[in-house]
């Protein structure tokens, strides 16, 4: 990942992140391209929890079918979430993911804890779960645990961010945290599942 100077997320520094050109699939798929590749990650887990990053033809299959529903099933089976959580997960439709878009390379685990500052004052993004995904995956993760100041968010003003989409793109990290760390994450996960419809 590229570094930028400074210990704080200021508009100058964060805009360098916001203005990085999106890295898209080599053949530049179109939003309606059914052969566009979604996911494909060198990792097959999120932390210690297995997560399916198999290449898929659609965002829905990649995000909902292969990640959200299986993780919801694991959480329900473990007694960490009520049965209703799986019903909510399986009730998410393709329309709930917003307008069609092409896959871009995302960090995949972009929270403030995955930013380190070196002895020269440069910030580095570490521990990626990089894959071909939706840009909202990183923005939703940034919003989930905080740590990014208003200057950082102002750098993204040019993006057509639909805040209604944030919950659905927070589901994978919330479900992973529920499965890994227990039912303390259940209320937030259920709220995100309900808001994803």
Predicted regions and their residues:
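Active-site Asp-x-Gly
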Residues: 59-61, 73, 102-105, 112-167, ...
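ATP-binding pocket architecture of kinase catalytic cores
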Residues: 1-58
């Amino acid at each position: 990942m590229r570094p930028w100077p400074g210990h704080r997320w200021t508009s100058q520094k964060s805009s360098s992140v916001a203005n990085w050109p999106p890295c898209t699939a080599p053949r530049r798929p179109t939003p309606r391209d059914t052969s566009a590749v979604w996911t494909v990650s060198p990792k097959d887990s999120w932390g210690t929890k297995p997560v399916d990053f198999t290449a898929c033809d659609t965002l829905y299959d990649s995000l909902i079918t292969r990640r959200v529903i299986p993780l919801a099933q694991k959480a329900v089976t473990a007694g960490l979430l009520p049965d209703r959580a799986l019903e909510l997960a399986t009730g998410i439709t393709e329309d709930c993911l917003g307008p069609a878009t092409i896959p871009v390379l995302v960090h995949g685990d972009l929270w403030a804890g995955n930013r380190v500052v070196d002895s020269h004052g440069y910030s580095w993004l570490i521990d990626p779960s990089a894959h071909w995904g939706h840009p909202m995956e990183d923005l939703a993760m940034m919003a989930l645990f905080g740590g990014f100041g208003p200057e950082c968010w102002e750098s993204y003003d040019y993006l057509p961010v639909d805040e209604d989409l944030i919950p659905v793109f927070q589901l994978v990290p919330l479900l992973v945290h529920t499965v890994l760390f227990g039912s303390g994450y259940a209320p937030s996960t259920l709220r995100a599942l309900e808001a994803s419809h």
